[in-house]
């Protein structure tokens, strides 16, 4: 919609007192003439928005500030020069021409210049400041696409300008410049660090991290009321990414919806999952957070569990939106535990590292042993195995015949892949529950398929144990009393050392001639890893 005629038509809707959904870089806004009290009232009615929740005025550039604001401080122009157009709203003293209905009864007004050329052109053509809260039903997740706007506003407004998906994905940052020092009222698309870099001291209002008290008057949008909420209740889990993923595995129910970082999505097979973005990609998380919350309204999930990024950069805004969606129902996953995953092919010598962990007081979990334990009474696992392989894998007493499963899967790669998928869906939760139950500060995971199962993602460190093939052959022959030919065939059937080396954080080459030397080297190696992890945590 970049042609002059379309822009003129959109501007005319605003001048006539109509409601127009407009795109910005943050979220879609529900726009109206901010000086027209009747038009502003229609915004509140269309959204079902509380009357004391102030609106933001959108302008095409900083030269419009003095039209609507008194005593504009130098800091406002400094911020405008540096960050406008962009995701920043400044709270300033309003002039009498700005209705109290627009400001929620306040003598201040939020001013913003959006970073969307079409929307700025529409505002310029209309000749009026455009009051534009997010174009969603009040309380629901904000709209980041025109389709989201249609879902909430169809039949209630006069038009939608489709500008494609929003590039930032969370609303603007709001800073109050009427107080000294300036105060952050709402985190958003411009990080707090950027404001402090420009102005020096900037304080943070308590409403950013906790619920406002009843009776308190909000000084800016997004401060007081439950916002961004899907229909199902939300629980937000804070803490390190790996720790919070383990927490979700332990606590989320079988039918819970999951919002998680990309690298953990595989662990929640069987759930309805909406990946938020990689744990280190907050720009992607900001773009996806509202879409993630909205997605679950199309499902039957009874609850939603969400991982939360740290508060650095855009993380403060993303976490704020998630916590408000949850009504500040937040649980902290950081338990101080260190999880080290040990993997490698048969005969590589994993036992040396596992024993070193045990000597450090670690709880060592053998994934294969946990799987066999689950075969006794995990009803969902047993049902899935019966559906996949039939009654032939069950003995007369109802127990699982592991040998019978082996006869099927080792002759048929598709069946082996099917078995892996079933086990990998069930075992992460069982292991996470055992991790949560132990009092040990260090946990070791022993798993040949640590990477393929997704379990490596929840380990604070992963170690590939490797050894030359000739060494492995001799170890397997001695350990299992098998022929050289059979030992080599077993090695050939597994991933090679290059695979494990590429997938893990560390490599321990266990080619030492005696068990005593191997265990001494392993102990030194484990101590190094643990010290490295503790130093990373302290940083």
Predicted feature descriptions by range:
Residues 351:
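Walker A/P-loop
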Residues 345:
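P-loop (Walker A) phosphate-binding loop of NTP-binding proteins
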Residues 372-439:
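ATP-dependent small-molecule kinase phosphotransfer cores
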Residues 1-334:
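Active-site-adjacent structural elements in enzyme catalytic cores
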Residues 3, 8, 433-442, 456-465, ...:
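NTP-dependent small-molecule kinase module
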Residues 348:
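ATP-binding Walker
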Residues 358-367, 380:
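Post-Walker A helix-loop "phosphate-sensing" segment adjacent to the P-loop in P-loop NTPases
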Residues 340-342:
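Hydrophobic anchor at the beta1->P-loop junction of P-loop NTPases
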């Amino acid at each position: 919609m970049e042609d002059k005629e379309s822009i003129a038509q959109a501007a005319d809707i605003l001048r006539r007192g109509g409601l127009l959904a407009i795109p910005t870089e943050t979220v879609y806004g529900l726009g109206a003439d901010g000086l027209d009290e009747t038009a502003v009232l229609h915004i509140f009615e269309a959204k079902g928005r509380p009357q004391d929740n102030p609106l933001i005025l959108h302008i095409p550039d900083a030269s419009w500030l003095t039209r609507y604001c008194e005593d504009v401080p130098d800091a406002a122009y400094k911020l405008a020069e540096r960050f406008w157009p962009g995701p920043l709203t400044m709270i300033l003293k309003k002039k009498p021409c700005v209705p109290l209905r627009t400001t929620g009864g306040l003598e201040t007004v939020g001013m913003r210049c959006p970073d969307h050329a079409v929307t700025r052109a529409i505002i310029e053509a209309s000749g009026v400041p455009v009051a534009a809260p997010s174009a969603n039903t009040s309380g629901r997740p904000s709209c980041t696409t025109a389709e989201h706007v249609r879902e909430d506003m169809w039949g209630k407004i006069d038009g939608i300008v489709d500008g494609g998906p929003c590039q930032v994905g969370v609303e603007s940052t709001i800073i109050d410049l009427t107080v000294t020092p300036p105060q952050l009222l709402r985190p958003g698309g411009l990080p707090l660090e950027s404001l402090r870099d420009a102005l020096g001291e900037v304080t943070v209002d308590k409403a950013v991290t906790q619920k406002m008290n009843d009776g308190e008057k909000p000084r800016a949008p997004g401060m007081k009321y439950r916002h961004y909420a899907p229909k199902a209740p939300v629980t937000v889990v804070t803490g390190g990414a790996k720790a919070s993923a383990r927490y979700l595995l332990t606590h989320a129910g079988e039918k819970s919806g999951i919002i998680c970082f990309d690298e953990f999505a595989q662990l929640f097979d069987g759930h309805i999952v909406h990946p938020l973005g990689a744990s280190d990609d907050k720009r992607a998380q900001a773009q996806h957070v509202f879409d993630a919350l909205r997605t679950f309204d199309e499902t039957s999930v009874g609850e939603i569990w969400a991982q939360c990024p740290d508060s650095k950069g855009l993380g403060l805004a993303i976490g704020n939106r998630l916590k408000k969606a949850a009504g500040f129902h937040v649980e902290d996953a950081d338990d101080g535990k260190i999880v080290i995953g040990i993997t490698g092919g048969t005969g590589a010598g994993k036992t040396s590292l596992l024993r070193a962990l045990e000597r450090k007081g670690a709880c060592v979990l053998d994934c294969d042993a946990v799987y066999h334990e689950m075969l006794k009474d995990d009803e969902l696992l047993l049902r899935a195995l019966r559906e996949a392989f039939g009654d032939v894998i069950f003995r007369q007493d109802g127990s699982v015949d592991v040998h019978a499963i082996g006869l099927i899967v080792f002759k048929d790669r598709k069946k082996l892949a099917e078995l892996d998928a079933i086990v990998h869906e069930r075992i992460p939760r069982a292991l996470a529950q055992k991790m949560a139950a132990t009092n040990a500060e260090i946990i070791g995971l022993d798993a040949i398929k640590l990477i393929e199962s997704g379990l490596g993602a929840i380990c604070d460190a992963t170690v590939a144990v490797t050894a030359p093939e000739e060494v492995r052959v001799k170890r397997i022959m001695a350990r299992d009393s098998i022929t050289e030919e059979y030992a080599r065939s077993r090695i050939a059937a597994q991933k090679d050392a290059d695979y494990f080396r590429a997938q893990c954080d560390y490599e321990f080459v266990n080619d030492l001639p005696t068990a005593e030397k191997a265990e001494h080297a392993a102990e030194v190696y484990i101590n190094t890893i643990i010290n490295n992890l503790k130093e990373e945590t302290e940083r």
